[in-house]
Amino acid sequence: FGLVGQGVDEDEWFDRASAFAGGEYARGIFLGDEITPADKDALAEHLSAFIGLPKDYLLVRNNRVELEDFRRDLLASRGLVCGRLDQRFTETSLLPSQRASFYFACEDPANHALESCWYVAFRDFLRGDLGYEGPEEYRLSVWGEIGIGWNWVHDEPGFDETTVAAPNLAYDIAVALRRSPTTKLCILGGRYDTATPWWNVRHTMSQLYLPDALKRQITWHRYGCGHMAYTDEPTLHAMAADLHEFYRE
């Protein structure tokens, strides 16, 4: 959006931001209100330089910004909100009276831009190629009615009483790799995905303390796309080549 990183390669900028997030920013946040005023001010200045929100905005929030606040406020002066599945997409802001947090979280410009295309293409495939005649209305997603009540409880391997609402499958991956050390794992992701951010995946995997032999079984590919790599044509070609190479190995 022309707010930060001008003149710097996007991958290089992403790497710089990731290093900041795992270093200076993490240390500052860990200190809580014990951080010195000078360090808090410097942290806000550096964070602003990376994410584009004003320094004063960050200081008021103690340098902590929720995703939905970021999406809502980054381009507020232009009357726009950012996407969640792909931050490159924008659309005009909701009215100030539309304050429901869950509603806004589901209002994703990236999804709105792509879903109608999927809907038309999928309906055409069902009827034209498969000869399927179904209900006139085919709903691509009913998350707000069904998914929100899904039972996410998961027993994490090696833990007692782990019936938590937000399951962590990283331990399952670690167990699978340790039990089958010849298994290969390919992890793909996009820079503009804030639904399942690339940095979060790297950080989670780093907490498994896998031996080097198992780490070498993991292949990483980061692309210039959002959550749905197949909607970005350059990424689609790159991902196909990377997956063909992975399967050959």
Predicted regions mapped to residue ranges:
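Active-site nucleophile elbow and catalytic-triad environment of alpha/beta-hydrolase enzymes
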Residues: E161-A176
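Short alpha-helix in the alpha/beta-hydrolase fold that links the catalytic acid
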Residues: N63, T183, P197-Q207
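Small-residue-rich helix-loop
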Residues: F89-T163
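Alpha/beta-hydrolase
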Residues: F1-N111
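Catalytic histidine-centered segment of alpha/beta-hydrolase-like enzymes
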Residues: G224-T235
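Acidic catalytic loop of the alpha/beta-hydrolase fold
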Residues: Y192-T196
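Short beta-strand/loop motif that positions the catalytic acidic residue
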Residues: C186-G189
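Short secondary-structure boundary/capping segments
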Residues: F1, V201-M205, T235-M239
